């Protein structure tokens, strides 16, 4: 078991420890449970799906990197597939606070990067901030998305974000988590860049059209990709680097182990992620970063 989970694991009931232990003891446990695993844990622990999501919040919060606030937030995104995806806040020193990944963003992007096509519910240990409410409003099924908080009745997102501004106000009908491929190509590039290109092709950028993706390779040889997730309100948009760093953190790898990175974006786009990605990666100790342009 990854050391970050040890204290939180001890908070669980004995039956839940017995059911969950073999799963999180796996060296490759990546802070998610498949639908079959969720069902098996529910049966063994005598919990329903929503109760299990609440019970897992301490484990999700244990993934937080809250070096500035020291405030750990955990979230569980329940996919339409039945899978559970952990999320946790992630803060970065030496750059702007705007680079922070919020726990709800973390769980949603985690699900998206694992090719989930929609969410039933997001369970979180603290009330979602306005930033996160707006971020979740970009989802295809935002109208039916349930928000679940300890000590409160479940409520749909619109309860927390009434009279919302969203994609429909900008005549946008392609939404976050839709299955999309922009079809861009690059010639004569390495495997890492091809993964960054694939991420760019699956990014959500209907407002700026500035599709972008990134791929990070660690010292262990693992590769983590990130896609740009744009938002109708602009500021809650999640850059591709943050999406990749979040996936890496949830998988239990230290961002300081990144050795190589590749950024792919559209040439002459109105939005570029290159400069801030380069700065943040340098702060993490990675200076071997390739930059590739998709031609118009």
UniProtKB/Swiss-Prot annotation:
EC annotation from Swiss-Prot or TrEMBL: 3.5.4.5
Subunit structure: Homodimer.
Function: This enzyme scavenges exogenous and endogenous cytidine and 2'-deoxycytidine for UMP synthesis.
A Gene Ontology cellular-component term: cytosol
GO annotation terms (biological process): cytidine deamination
Keywords: Hydrolase, Metal-binding, Zinc
Note accompanying the cofactor annotation: Binds 1 zinc ion.
Domain of life where this protein originates: Bacteria
Residue numbers annotated as active site: 104 (proton donor)
Pfam family, one: dCMP_cyt_deam_2
Cofactor(s) needed by this chain: Zn(2+)
Name of the protein described by the UniProt record: Cytidine deaminase
Keyword Metal-binding: yes
């Amino acid at each position: 078991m990854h050391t970050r989970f040890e204290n939180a694991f001890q908070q669980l009931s004995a039956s839940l420890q017995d059911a969950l232990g073999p799963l999180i003891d796996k060296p490759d446990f990546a802070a998610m449970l498949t639908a079959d695993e969720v069902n098996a844990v529910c049966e063994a622990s005598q919990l329903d799906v929503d109760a299990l999501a609440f019970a897992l919040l301490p484990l999700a919060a244990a993934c937080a990197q809250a070096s500035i606030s020291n405030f750990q937030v955990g979230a569980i995104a329940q996919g339409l597939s039945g899978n559970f995806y952990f999320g946790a806040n992630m803060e970065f020193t030496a750059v702007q606070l705007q680079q922070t990944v919020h726990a709800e963003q973390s769980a949603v992007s985690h699900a998206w990067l694992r090719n989930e096509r929609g969410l039933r519910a997001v369970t979180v240990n603290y009330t979602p901030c306005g930033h996160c409410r707006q971020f979740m409003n970009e989802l295809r099924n935002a109208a039916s998305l349930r928000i679940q908080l300890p000590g409160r009745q479940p409520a749909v997102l619109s309860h927390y974000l009434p009279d919302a501004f969203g994609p429909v106000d900008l005549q946008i009908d392609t939404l976050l988590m839709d299955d999309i491929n922009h079809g861009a190509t690059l010639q004569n590039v390495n495997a890492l860049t091809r993964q960054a290109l694939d991420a760019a092709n699956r990014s959500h950028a209907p407002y700026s059209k500035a599709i972008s993706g990134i791929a990070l390779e660690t010292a262990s040889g693992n590769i983590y990709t990130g896609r740009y997730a744009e938002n109708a309100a602009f500021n809650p948009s999640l850059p591709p680097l943050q999406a990749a760093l979040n996936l890496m953190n949830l998988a239990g790898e230290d961002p300081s182990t990144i050795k190589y990175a590749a950024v792919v974006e559209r040439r002459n786009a109105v939005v570029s992620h290159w400069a801030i990605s380069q700065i943040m990666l340098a702060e993490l100790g990675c200076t071997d970063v390739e930059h590739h342009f998709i031609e118009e």
